Amino acid sequence: MSLKNVLENLSGFVAAEIAAAGVLKGDGRPDLKPEMDGKPKGTIYKDNSVTDGAVLWLKTGNGRNWKVISGDTGWQPVRRTNSLAASSSIKIRRMGDTVFWAFGGGQWGWFGITRRGGQGYDGHGSFGNKGCKIVQVGGIPDGFKTPNSVVGSMYKDGLKQYGTIYLGGMSDSNYIAVGFIDDIPTDRETLDIRVSALNYPTDQEWPRLDVLRNQGFI
């Protein structure tokens, strides 16, 4: 037997052993492939295409029960309300089971909102003159939601506290609002906001970025 044949046989044997051990490779998400439904619990799948930023998947149950064990969506822009200043942006990212938010876009990385009562301004009723929504009700995308609401802090360029930022969880409409200690001005924008780190664990299925883009969430 030639060396080439020996190596080919060895390669085939190793591939068979890897497959038997539950490690598979392919292109695309396994949770969208009917042919993967019958794979045993504990199977590990590597997506060579890194679809939606997910690299490694673990089969956790029967059918299409898969969990991403290594993945990163990268920063994705989130649809915002018109309460934001024109230069401001909101981005979201999921790494593994942790969701991160970023608020900035302005000069020196500041975040800002428009004046109270301005065109498109979206007030938040329970905050009165002191708050507005920056991500609309239902605006947090699937795959990035939290069952529990989260509260962070806002600062005037890091010097003093402006107020709080509130992220409503699945039990409270999946939106984000900001609330200030003082009334939001009616004659000028507030452009020098710094927002504290806002992140949390999620147990939602891995997001489908193409679907979210088509739906206008990102």
Question: Which residue stretches match the model-derived regions?
Answer:
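Acidic glycine-/aspartate-rich tracts in secreted/extracellular proteins
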Residues: S49-D52, G61-N65, G105-W108, G143-N148, ...
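Short, surface-exposed terminal/edge motifs of secreted or surface/virion proteins that either
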Residues: K41-G71, V99-W101
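Extracellular/surface-exposed low-complexity repeats and stalk/linker segments enriched in Gly/Pro
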Residues: L3-T51
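Extracellular beta-strand-rich recognition modules
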Residues: F100-G105, V178
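Surface-exposed ligand/attachment interfaces on beta-rich extracellular proteins
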Residues: L24-K39, S70-M95, G106-F144
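Generic beta-strand structural signal
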Residues: K59-G61, R93-R94, L167-S171
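Extracellular jelly-roll beta-sandwich "head" domains, especially the C-terminal globular C1q domain
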Residues: A85-S89, G112, G118, G123-I218
